[in-house]
Structures are given as structure tokens and as C-alpha cells.
């Protein structure tokens, strides 16, 4: 009986083909992995986790995790869309040290082209700071992230988030309140995509 099950398993693997997964165009459309399936329909909606280093080749970006979801399969090629990003926990832990203050902000935004996102930002102050200073820094986060959402389309907002540009703007403004060790966009989740009118 066990031998029969083993044969059946081998037969199922023989039927499977490997599909090449590609990053979204605005991440360069590069190959980011392979996935097996016995039917192309089963590849649809699969989510792959890669790092920004895998996409760009930049070893300093290995702590940035990206999530791409397959939305189309043509032949052996599987094409993806961006579903989210987050920073590795180990990286976040390395930023938060004794006698520092971590300020978190969670913001639901809508980009210029109608994508609804949940954006989580964080800032690390060099020392313990007052509650009023925390509030002021969180307000700066909110103002910059909302302003960027109004100005940028989905693709540009995501790129400016993962490459650190938005975080750099937050750090620049927040240091007027108190010097920061670091500011980061630590997580993005796509909540809703705009409906395409046929």
C-alpha cells in the first residue's frame, strides 16, 4: 500500500511543470523564483516572498521583504503584482536599543490613482523622549505620508517607501523635534485596488 502511495506521489510530480515567477514591471520585471504546478490555474494567486536584495542585487537591502502575488500566467511565465512589504524582525530589533524611544504610526491612505494601503511607519529617537515629542513626531509621519499619497501614484509611492526616500523625509523633519537614530516605513499592505471599468 505504501509503495502504491509512493508511486502515485511520483506520478503527480511527473505531471508538474515549473513556472518562472517575475517581479512587477516597476521592480524591473526580473525573475524572482520558480514554482511547480500541474495546472497553470493553480499558479494564479500564489504569493511569493522575496527580499529587495533579490530584486536589485543590493546586499544592504536584504532586510526588506517584498510580497508579490501571481495574477497572470502565459506559457511557463507567471507575472505578479505587489501585495505588500515589511522589514525583517531581526532588523527592527537591531534598531531598538536601551534608552531609545520607538515611535510607531499606522496610517490608512489612498494613493493618487486610487489604491488603498495600510502604511506602518516607525522612528527611533536617540534617547528617551517626552510624550509630547512622540506625538509631534507621529504627526510629522502622518503629514508626510498623507502628502506623498496625494502626490504619487501607487507604483511611485511603493518605490519611494522601499528605497527609503519617504523615511528620509520623515527623519529630516522629525529631527527638528528630536534627533532620530532611524526612520523607516516598516510595513505596507495593499487593502484595495481601484476597480477597472471595462
UniProtKB/Swiss-Prot annotation:
InterPro entries: Ribosomal_eS1, Ribosomal_eS1_arc, Ribosomal_eS1_CS. PROSITE patterns: RIBOSOMAL_S3AE. One of its GO terms (biological process) is translation. GO terms for cellular component: ribonucleoprotein complex; ribosome. SMART domains: Ribosomal_S3Ae. Keywords: Ribonucleoprotein, Ribosomal protein. It holds the Pfam family Ribosomal_S3Ae. GO terms for molecular function: structural constituent of ribosome. Part of the 30S ribosomal subunit. PANTHER family: 40S RIBOSOMAL PROTEIN S3A. Belongs to the eukaryotic ribosomal protein eS1 family. This is Small ribosomal subunit protein eS1. It comes from Pyrococcus furiosus (strain ATCC 43587 / DSM 3638 / JCM 8422 / Vc1). The lineage of its organism: Archaea, Methanobacteriati, Methanobacteriota, Thermococci, Thermococcales.
